[in-house]
């Protein structure tokens, strides 16, 4: 998997998450976390929040390729979800240990964890699934130049939706 495909896919998946979160207020999907703390995350931290989301997905998939070097397609999806679940559980214990008020981002994550509970694991698994699937399809179908264009277009679009109310 090309890194440009992975980064571009993570950007577009985050764009989709933000569209659902920002443009569908009040639309509660029963098996996904509520959008309250997630909207606060994007509203308060803007592009830093977007960067953290995209980098989290990219690093998770890259770790999956390191630990499971022969994984591809559905195997890579499952490997990425495995890494993501480990990360989410570890990160949950980290945020519990950080006192309220010490880190603004961690404070929002605490609210998100309280609000979303186990549904966060499912939402993050869908993010990993989308990222791996899009990156894999792009690698199979498109040239490097076209993927680079899609990635830049995604970055450009993500900047604008980040500041949409």
Residue ranges of predicted features:
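Phosphate-/polyanion-interacting regions in eukaryotic proteins
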Residues: 122
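Juxtamembrane/disordered regions of integral membrane proteins
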Residues: 1-119, 129, 133-165
């Amino acid at each position: 998997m090309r890194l440009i495909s992975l980064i571009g896919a993570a950007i577009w998946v985050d764009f989709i998450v933000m569209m659902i979160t920002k443009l569908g207020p009040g639309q509660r999907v029963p098996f996904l976390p509520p959008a309250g703390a997630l909207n606060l995350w994007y509203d308060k931290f803007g592009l830093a929040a977007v960067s953290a989301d995209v980098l989290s997905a990219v690093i998770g998939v890259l770790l999956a390729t390191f630990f499971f070097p022969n994984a591809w397609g559905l195997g890579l999806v499952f490997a990425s979800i495995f890494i993501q679940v480990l990360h989410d559980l570890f990160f949950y214990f980290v945020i519990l240990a950080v006192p309220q008020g010490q880190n603004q981002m961690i404070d929002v994550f605490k609210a998100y964890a309280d609000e979303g509970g186990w549904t966060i694991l499912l939402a993050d698994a869908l993010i990993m699934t989308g990222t791996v699937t899009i990156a894999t399809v792009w690698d199979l179908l498109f040239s490097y130049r076209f993927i680079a264009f899609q990635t830049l277009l995604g970055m450009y679009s993500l900047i604008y939706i980040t500041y949409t109310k």
